[in-house]
Amino acid sequence: LIAAVARGGAIGRGNDLPWHLPEDLKHFRASTQGTPVIMGRRTWDSLPPRFRPLPGRTNIVVTRDPAWQAEGALRAGSLEEARAAAGDAPRAFVIGGGELYRAALPLADELRLTELDLDVPDADVFFPDWRAAGFEEVTRERRHAAAPNHFDFDFVTYTRSARGT
């Protein structure tokens, strides 16, 4: 799983990110390049059209709509179908949204989170509470957001511990 998460687990507002953080977009691209990305249909819809599909990645969209199709994307009816569509790839990233993160968390070996020191009081989509799910922090890189942003953030990688399995 890969996500940018503000305080309180906020990840979305009105089918969009409640922040614009170029540093995180670069981190996301570098982390996911060349790997399948699995997303819900609303996450797909939230991508700017010029970035659909996300280049250099197999885009797999999970939707209950059997008629849904989009150029450059594979349709999956469930997370299990999406994992099968990823084929033999050594890893695939779930990139949102909240419902898919909740379904995928018990299956995840790794979380790559951008933890934002930012409050989003009107957020309407949240990352699931993963802290009791058996993950241990393995790396943390502290950063300060470039102007016009005025908050700090961390790139953090967590892996599932042997105790958490």
Describe each region flagged by the PLM.
Residues 3-36, 41-162:
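Flexible, gly/pro- and Lys/Arg-enriched active-site loops
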